[in-house]
Amino acid sequence: MKDIFLIRHGRQCSKLCNVDVSLDESGRKQAKLAGKRLISYQLEKLYCSQLIRAKETAEIIGHCVNLPVEEVADIEEIHFGGFTGKTDEQIRTEYAEFRKERASHKEDLPYPEGGECGRDVVKRVMPKIKQICQREENRVAIVTHGGVIRSVCADILHTGQENKLKFGIDLENTSF
């Protein structure tokens, strides 16, 4: 039986939706605290998304648990389409109809303008997680993103992607 810790990256510098930026000071502190908490779990391998905030989080954790970090392609955050690079206020204004439809809809809707839905994320990410599971290490951590963790958990728990925000997983930065 393998133990896999899915860890959300630390807090980032930008408040813009899904831009590839560094951690802020709080995010670095969060990563260090997560690393200290993970010492007792005796991780054997540490993986991360290729986005800067996940890499920086993993590097700080890796320093704490004395492990190198291996970057994994295709475990990046859900592609938010037209939301990318916009503030919350811009999204609320420009995509009010989409947000309303998404909140009331029973389907797992993709984000507008070429964005992904949860099923798309699962199709992209699960093959990578399965590859990690086939490796020899039994206790691993993967530093990734909130949308990825929610989508993967919804898939594993068979709750349906449309319910991924409702089943009570607290995904504060660096939670696992």
Per-range role (PLM):
Residues 4, 136-146:
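Generic beta-sheet signal
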Residues 4-6, 10-57, 114-125:
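Loop-to-helix element that buttresses phosphate recognition and phosphoryl-transfer chemistry
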Residues 13-17, 78-83, 109-113:
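A short acidic, helix-capping loop that chelates divalent metal ions and anchors anionic groups
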Residues 33-100:
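Phosphate-coordination/substrate-recognition cap region in phosphate-metabolizing enzymes
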Residues 40-42, 132-138:
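Glycine-rich phosphate-binding loop signature in dinucleotide/nucleotide-binding domains
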Residues 99-120:
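Short glycine/proline- and acidic residue-enriched helix-loop micro-motifs
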Residues 146-150, 175:
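GST superfamily/GST-like fold recognition
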Residues 159-176:
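Domain-level recognition of soluble alpha/beta enzyme cores
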